Amino acid sequence: MNPTDIADTTLDESIYNNYYLYENIPKPCTKEGIKAFGELFLPPLYSLVFLFGLLGNSVVVVVLFKYKRLKSMTDVYLLNLAISDLLFVLSLPFWGYYAADQWVFGLGLCKIISWMYLVGFYSGIFFIMLMSIDRYLAIVHAVFSLRARTLTYGVITSLATWSVAVLASLPGLLFSTCYTERNHTYCKTKYSRNSTRWKVLSSLEINILGLVIPLGTMLFCYSMIIRTLQHCKNEKKSKAVRMVFAVVALFLGFWAPYNVVLFLETLVELEVLQDCTFERHLDYAIQATETLAFVHCCLNPVIYFFLGEKFRKYLVQLFKTCRGPFMLCQYCRLLQMYSPDTPSSSYTQSTGDHDLHDAL
């Protein structure tokens, strides 16, 4: 074998090795279809959530200020829950436009809207948890609640709740950034390559503060409420128990899927799960479960406000004074037909059932 043959053999081996080495390099996971899906479905869904959430929670705020005038801890929590949901839904037009096109609002608004979204997210869930504790005190510890469930304590705990929500949302403010990739501008939470710890902590924070602690609190409070109501011989007891189950089931049904998907996304970020097909399905699941969770802020006014007899009465009074569209006035008359003239209740003050009835 001469030097030319050796050179040819070496060249052939090099081409062979390069070919198979290239074949073994993992190909990038393409997700163009996911973006197209988001562009088509997310903007109209976000728009619907924005409209219904804005309308429902605005009515709650107006009724509370016009008729209730914040006389109790429950009123304070209802007001703050409505403000939390309003803060949350006001960020949706920006995310809707972003899903349809790209981020065009600059770095400043990217940080502000991301932070506002998270503050609304955390504070809304925290106030739902406080509503559960408020009902627990009113029904299970009725005597003690006369001292604890005051307007002053309601304001103090609300301020503390907003402080915790703001602090929990700081990572969104600090790490949200704008960047351009393939002529497309993004607004995302972006960590440095060596900050895996922050990714894990942020996901765990959402799972723990957004689901585990609130759900655990609600399960404890409502199980004790049901236990107390079982000893009450009352014709409206079954309705109250059904409403308790509805509150827990709706919270679990709307928020648990989103938290599970976020946990799986964390495993992908940590490279525990590595499969392109799974990642694509996970991205679809994130879009679907996130939108499902958004809908819960539209249901909060119905769950915690409109289903109470007193609040329905106030709502009828509000629409009686309206000079708006004909359909709203027709809806007003329909509400009046199904609402009692007086907020009758057979719950006694000693058991606190009247508070549950009004809140639900």
UniProtKB/Swiss-Prot annotation:
Major localisation: membrane
One cellular component term from this protein's GO annotations in UniProt: external side of plasma membrane
Membrane-side (Extracellular) residue stretches: 1-39, 99-111, 176-206, 268-284
A Pfam family annotated for this UniProt entry: 7tm_1
Disulfide bonds: 110-187
Record's comment on post-translational modification: In natural killer cells, CCL22 binding induces phosphorylation on yet undefined Ser/Thr residues, most probably by beta-adrenergic receptor kinases 1 and 2.
GO annotation, biological process: calcium-mediated signaling; cell chemotaxis; homeostasis of number of cells; immune response; inflammatory response; interneuron migration; positive regulation of cytosolic calcium ion concentration; tolerance induction
Listed InterPro entries: CCR1-9-like, Chemokine_CCR4, Chemokine_rcpt, GPCR_Rhodpsn, GPCR_Rhodpsn_7TM
Keyword Membrane belongs to the record: yes
Family the UniProt entry places it in: Belongs to the G-protein coupled receptor 1 family.
Name of the protein in question: C-C chemokine receptor type 4
Protein's organism: Canis lupus familiaris (Dog)
Lineage of producing organism: Eukaryota, Metazoa, Chordata, Craniata, Vertebrata
Gene label: CCR4
